Amino acid sequence: MASGDDSPIFEDDESPLCSLEKMTDLVAVWDVALSDGVHKIEFEHGTTSGKRVVYVDGKEEIRREWMFKLVGKETFFVGAAKTKATINIDAISGFAYEYTLEIDGKSLKKYMENRSKTTNTWVLHLDGEELRVVLEKDTMDVWCNGQRMETAGEFVDDGTETHFSVGNHDCYIKAVSSGKRREGIIHTLIVDNREIPELTQ
């Protein structure tokens, strides 16, 4: 079983039963939030067969059979930006194993902490659809449900506005100074002249 800060989230009742039947050696599941969406990473480790299988969003990325060395690592890529991910397999005692996930060379926990400083995320419902809007603060790229949006920047009296459209809805992210050095710039999503609360991660 997995342990540590980067331990997986185990299968819940919402997952289809057929995927559990198919994945008989499923040992770890992680949900990873990237700019283009939340990706589910599943790992099968057959400690008697030597099998290792990595699935990203239900699609098989890596399959290795008859691996005689049961510890090691598997490296693959996740999401539209091809973010590097590595699953580390370590023996902790006897036939017990620990599975940890690294994203861009950092533990999942450290990566998510860093990401919360470099991105803002909003979730809202528009026209009966759930939308996930992500602002990458370092590049000012805006993503909506996995698509990088066409944007137009505009300077205004109290800061900047980054405009984009979702369907027939006018949206913009307003950036204003907090006036406090430690807080920095405050980003606010406005959709149809309505402020959307930020998702806290």
UniProtKB/Swiss-Prot annotation:
One GO term (biological process): positive regulation of canonical NF-kappaB signal transduction
Location within or outside the cell: Cytoplasm
Keywords: Apoptosis, Cytoplasm
Keyword field contains Nucleotidyltransferase: no
Membership in a protein family: Belongs to the FAIM1 family.
Record function comment: Plays a role as an inducible effector molecule that mediates Fas resistance produced by surface Ig engagement in B cells.
Name of the protein this chain belongs to: Fas apoptotic inhibitory molecule 1
